[in-house]
Amino acid sequence: VASLVGSEMCIRDRCMPGGKIAVYTGMLEVTKNTNGLAAVMGHEIAHAVAKHSVERASRGAILNTGTQLLDIFTGGKLSQVNRATGMDTIGLLSQLGIMNPFTRKQESEADYLGMIFSSLSGYDIRETTKIWERMKEFNKGKSQPEFLSTHPSADNRIKKINEWTNKIILEYPPIKIS
């Protein structure tokens, strides 16, 4: 199920648990055309097909268990301040060292699979690079270092997408329906 959500101020799209997809109308400024919109939709469909939200929830539960084990191993003897500091530190290190790299990997996987889905559907996947160039321009001066982000940087995305484009066009041509 896909929905177009009315918010010109929000340049965003997302796949929610259960595979529901939302594209905010502000994203249409970046996609510019049907090939661009197909790239965005393909990316979000890839998140649903690959069950990325389930993977993230599972990984989060495992990390939460790890922080609870710390509490058990210390016998609950840490002061509230030390306990909170320890939990916050573990949470931050887990986010930066485990969750962020994991979700960046999922984003790259969704980029790749989304390009395949779009190509099979007959859309021009060369538009994907143009979307990321526009996103890079839109976010100029607002982006954070990649290691702090759940998403690859625009530069890394553009590089990977350019590496994949010709291969995908050759290996996954549009499906002919007769």
Predicted regions and their residues:
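Short helix/loop segments within enzyme catalytic domains
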Residues: 84-148, 174-177
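Membrane-active amphipathic alpha-helices enriched in small hydrophobic residues
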Residues: 58-77, 86-98
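Extracytoplasmic
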Residues: 7-8, 16-20, 32-34, 112, ...
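Catalytic Zn2+-binding segment of zinc metalloproteases
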Residues: 34-36, 45-61, 74-77
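Active-site His/Glu-centered metal-binding helix of metallohydrolases
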Residues: 10, 41-53, 109, 113
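Short pre-active-site segment immediately N-terminal to the catalytic Zn-binding motif
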Residues: 22-39
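Catalytic and substrate-binding regions of cell-wall glycan-acting enzymes that process beta-1,4-linked
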Residues: 141-164
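Single conserved hydrophobic/aromatic residue that forms the stacking wall/gate
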Residues: 1-6, 10-11
